[in-house]
């Protein structure tokens, strides 16, 4: 998007990568939403930025956080969520909403036991990134993640999914704190993008049903998988992104 004339700020989430903060490798429905709002704080004070023409873009889990940020931050005028996950939903209910009450209770029990162990040890246990080697019965979307995160295609030494993953206990708040509770009150423009063959497509489709008003759009990319929208230039609709931002950041 920078090559198309936009002033772009890319950031590592709080407590990860080149961003500061302790403890490291924490995920949070609140903090990771605030990451976008903090980016808007910074941009709005830059001389070269028109504070009334700020948009955001989130990918995968941060697509959901971007949508949540749009619900809370009225300074955001246009939001793109690409191949999004609702991390609170998938954590609390499992993939395709298959987790029942007993399974959710067991998850809470395990995570709270881990909290005690972490406190005793003085360190946070990591959940692990993408499995390597893959089990033979791994679902196709997990194989796709492996192809991205565990190969030169997407591997980075600071990528949590490529390495040790997030803190295990980071999952706890996502179980109890749904991030998209007020997405129906978003008044700014929203573009949801998802691959036709993505296992996660239902997140965008359901989010779109909740959004109100005429300035909301769901774009399904024919034949694309979830990770195609990470880095595949043949699948990522750059022309549409440019058109969307130019229309709503006038």
Predicted regions span which residues?
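Conserved alpha/beta-hydrolase
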Residues: 1-20
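Catalytic active-site module of serine/aspartate enzymes centered on a nucleophile-bearing elbow/loop
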Residues: 222-250
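Short beta-strand/loop motif that positions the catalytic acidic residue
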Residues: 186, 192-194
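Short glycine-enriched nucleophile-adjacent loop
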Residues: 43, 63-74, 207
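Alpha/beta-hydrolase active-site loop
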Residues: 26-47
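Alpha/beta-hydrolase fold nucleophile elbow
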Residues: 47-61
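Alpha/beta-hydrolase-fold enzymes
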Residues: 67-150
């Amino acid at each position: 998007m920078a090559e198309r004339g936009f002033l772009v700020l890319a950031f590592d989430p709080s407590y990860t990568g080149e961003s500061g903060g302790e403890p490291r490798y924490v995920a949070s429905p609140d903090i990771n939403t605030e990451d976008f709002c903090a980016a808007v704080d910074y941009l709005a004070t830059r001389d070269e930025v028109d504070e009334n023409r700020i948009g955001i873009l989130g990918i995968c889990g941060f697509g959901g956080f971007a949508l949540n940020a749009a619900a809370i931050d009225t300074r955001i005028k246009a939001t793109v969520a690409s191949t999004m996950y609702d991390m609170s939903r998938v954590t609390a209910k499992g993939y395709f909403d298959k987790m029942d009450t007993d399974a959710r209770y067991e998850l809470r029990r395990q995570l709270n036991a881990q909290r005690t162990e972490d406190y005793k040890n003085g360190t946070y246990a990591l959940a692990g990134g993408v499995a390597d080697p893959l089990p033979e019965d791994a679902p196709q979307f997990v194989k796709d993640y492996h192809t991205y995160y565990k190969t030169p295609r997407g591997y980075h030494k600071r990528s949590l999914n490529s390495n040790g993953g997030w803190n295990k206990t980071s999952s706890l708040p996502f179980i109890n704190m749904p991030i998209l509770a007020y997405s129906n009150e978003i008044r700014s423009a929203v573009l949801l993008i998802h691959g036709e063959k993505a296992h996660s497509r239902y997140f965008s489709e359901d989010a779109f049903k909740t959004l109100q008003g005429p300035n909301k759009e769901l774009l399904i990319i024919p034949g694309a998988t979830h990770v195609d929208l990470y880095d595949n230039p043949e699948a990522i609709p750059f022309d549409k992104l440019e058109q969307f931002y130019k229309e709503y950041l006038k």
